[in-house]
Amino acid sequence: MEFKQGDRVRIEKNGTVYEGKVMPSMEGYITIKMKSGYNAGFSIDKVSITPLENNGEAANGGNGGKNGQKEPEPAKEKVSKPGLPKVSILSTGGTIASKIDYRTGAVTSQFTADDILAAIPELKEIADFKGRAISSILSENMDPDSWQNLARAVVEEIEAGADGIIVTHGTDTMMYSAAALSFMIETPVPIVFVGSQRSADRPSSDNAMNAICAARVAISDIAEVVVVMHGTSSDDYCEIHRGTKVRKMHTSRRDAFKSVNSLPIGTVDYDTGEIKTFIEYTGRGEKSLKFKPGMEPKCAIVKFTPGADPSVLDCYVDGGYKGLVLEGTGLGHVSTKWIPFIRRAVDAKMPVIVTSQCLNGRVCDRVYDTGRDMLKAGAIEGEDTLPETALVKLMWVLGQTDEFEKAVSMLGENLSGEINECTLR
């Protein structure tokens, strides 16, 4: 029986029937992806295999168009409803825009913004949507240039009259992109990042709920850059996280994203669409649109570990890097052996921001001698800023000014909600 990767087949073995799409398989075997999301493998000579059309009926070559070929699929219906708020969906790729590629068995970014809209019909009741593909990549391939291209596209959509923006994005580096846009754009409307932990063809996919909740936030009064993702492992509500205070805290759970050193801005109830807020936020229209691009890519995070060779800092200084984020222990400490190397970096006009590996809590280098020595060497306390956010902030600040003293001053300011005045327990 002839079949190829991507074909739908019915397999019978010992009276049990299995259906699914053919995946890459070893010679003499067939592996299928079943509707449940699980894979099943069989020895070809021990099963009966029947090719199926997409509707599950056995293929006979007579109802699929000329010469047994499938008729072209009808054009996707545009999801649009005039009179509702105008929301632009900008797709960059990631799991929310992914499905299984049956040529390789891997998850690939194959959907566009319009595909997402067509796949989730509930969206058309919320807003009048416009889809725009910015890229189709997994988020590990995003970089500072990608952030700036995305930011420009967001600004263009707002200037064109969008009442809200949704950015579909891979979850692994979504916090970096959200932070980058938080620093680059002052926005009068919501800019909502959303993704999913599980691809659209898996029964446990979180893409639909996350997208629907993101749409609710995109038409809300919350005019900030935010991340909207599952609040629990159940399909009950999503949390709204400030773009500079959010972090992915689990590799695969649907509720992987958490606000750190802050409460979420609020929650969105999946069933009712009700938004509850917990902390102050910038309201719709409170700020005029401002766009300040510019990112210095030659910045890095250095994680201190016991016994680590401090000369690694010299590698960055001699390599022409412009700024460093140190992940210190506890309150923000490194070994005393690192102090001269920090001083050399600062003397080379390289800002050095200190954050904590603890994530929760605030850096305070005025308690112990080592911390005081770090400050004397010129290190900058990152307060309660996340290391990843500190890196993006550093890149953005150095993209705005070449003056060392001005950069140091800006890095100590709360520019986009990345620093809280008081530490949250």
UniProtKB/Swiss-Prot annotation:
Domain Asparaginase/glutaminase: 85-414
InterPro entries: AsnA_fam (IPR006033), Asp/glu_Ase-like_sf (IPR036152), Asparaginase/glutaminase-like (IPR006034), Asparaginase/glutaminase_AS1 (IPR020827), Asparaginase/glutaminase_AS2 (IPR027475), Asparaginase_C (IPR040919), GatD (IPR011878), GatD_N (IPR040918)
Active site residues per record: T95, T171, D172, K248
Basic and acidic residues: compositionally biased ranges: 68-80
PROSITE patterns cross-referenced by the UniProt entry: ASN_GLN_ASE_1 (PS00144), ASN_GLN_ASE_2 (PS00917), ASN_GLN_ASE_3 (PS51732)
Enzyme Commission number(s) of this protein: 6.3.5.-
Main enzyme class: ligase
Transmembrane helix among keywords: no
A Pfam family reported for this protein in Swiss-Prot or TrEMBL: Asparaginase
Residue span of region Disordered: 53-84
Family, similarity comment: Belongs to the asparaginase 1 family. GatD subfamily.
Record's function text: Allows the formation of correctly charged Gln-tRNA(Gln) through the transamidation of misacylated Glu-tRNA(Gln) in organisms which lack glutaminyl-tRNA synthetase. The reaction takes place in the presence of glutamine and ATP through an activated gamma-phospho-Glu-tRNA(Gln). The GatDE system is specific for glutamate and does not act on aspartate.
PANTHER family per UniProt: 60 KDA LYSOPHOSPHOLIPASE, L-ASPARAGINASE
HAMAP family linked to this entry: GatD (MF_00586)
The protein's name: Glutamyl-tRNA(Gln) amidotransferase subunit D
Gene: gatD
